[in-house]
C-alpha cells in the first residue's frame, strides 16, 4: 500500500473523528441542565419577564420627563449664522461727460456678500409658581411610575410563585395517580386470582379492572397537566420552553406568625398600588397650582448680540433687557384648566381612599385565609394518614377473604382522594402566602433576600 492510498484512507477517517468529537461536544453542551430554585426563578423573572421590563422602562421615561422640566431653571441660549450672496444683472451704466452729456454704456453685473451672526439668550426670572409646580407635577408622576414598576414586580413575581407551586402540585398529583394505578393493578390481580381458583366472582374482577382503567386515564391526564404547568411557569419567568431547565422544589410548609394589625400597617406603608394612588393625589395638587399660575405674569431677562455686514469685520450690536408677559384674555383657557385639574384631583383623592379600603380588606382576607388553610392542611394530613391505614387494612382483609371488593375499592378511592386534597391544600397554602406578601408589596424583600 503506497503513501497516496494511505492518505486517501486516513484523512477522511481523521475528519470523521473530528466531526464526531465536535458533534458530541455540542450535544453535551446543549444538554446541560440548569437547576432553578424558587429564588432563582424569581431573580430570572425580574431580569427577563417582558411585563416587568415594560414597567421598568416606563418608569425610566418618567425620570427623563421630570428632568425635562428642569430646563426652565436654566437660560435658553441659541445662536444663528448666515451667509447670502445677492447678484445684480445688467445694471444701467450711465456716464456724465464734462460738457454735461450723458453717455449710456452697456449694463454691468455685480454681486454683494451678506454675512450675519446672532446670539440670543432668555432666562425666566419669576413665574409665580408655574415653573416650580410643573416640575413638582412631573416629580410626583415619576414617583408614581416607580410605584407602578414595583407593583408590576410584585404582581408578576406572585404569578411565578403561583405557577411554581402549581407545577409541583401537579407533579405530586401525578405521583398520586401513579400510586392509584399501582393499587388498582394489585386489586385487579388479586380479584382475578381469586376468580380463577373459584373463591371469587367475575364481578369483583371486572370491577377492579374498570377501576384500574379509569385510574390509567386519570394518570394520562395528569402527565399533560404537568407539562402545561411547566410551560406556564417558564412563560411567567420569561424563559423559552426548553427541557434544559430543571426546577427544584424549595417550598417549605411553615406556620405564619405575624399579627393582622402589623400586616395592615405594613401594607399601608409599602403597598405599591397605594403609593401610586398617593403620588397621583400629590401630582394632581401640583397640577391645580400650576393651572392657577396661568393668571399671573412671568418675568424674563433677554440678551442678544447680532453682527451683519457685507465683509468682515461685522457691524456688531448688543441688546439686553427685561420683559414681562401679562395674560389678559385667552378664551377661558386658564379657567378650564383649573376646573379640569380640580376634577382630576378629586378623582385621585377618591381613588386613593378606594385603594386603601380595598387593600385593608384584601390583607385581612389574605390573613384569615392563610391561617385557615394552615389548619386545614394539618387536618388533611391526618385524614391522609388515616385513609392510607384504612386502605391497607381493607386490602389485608380482602386478601384473607374477609373483606369485599367494594370495600377495597372504596377504601382506595378515599385514600387517593385524601392524598389529593392534602397535596392541593398544601400548595394552596404556598400561593396564599405569596398573595399576602404581594398585597403587602414585599415579595422581593421576603423571597429574594
Predicted regions, residues:
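Sec-dependent signal peptide cleavage junction
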Residues: 24-43, 47, 58, 447
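Amphipathic alpha-helical coiled-coil scaffold segments and their short linker/junction regions
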Residues: 42-48, 98-101, 239-301, 446-449
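Acidic, low-complexity, intrinsically disordered peripheral segments
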Residues: 29-31, 38, 87, 241, ...
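Small/polar (Gly/Ser/Thr/Ala-rich) solvent-exposed segments
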Residues: 53, 76-94, 106-112, 122-151, ...
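Periplasmic alpha-helical coiled-coil/stalk elements that build and connect Gram-negative outer-membrane
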Residues: 1-8, 36, 40, 155-266, ...
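Amphipathic alpha-helical coiled-coil segments
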Residues: 54-69, 152, 156-178, 186, ...
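Bacterial N-terminal signal peptides
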Residues: 12-23
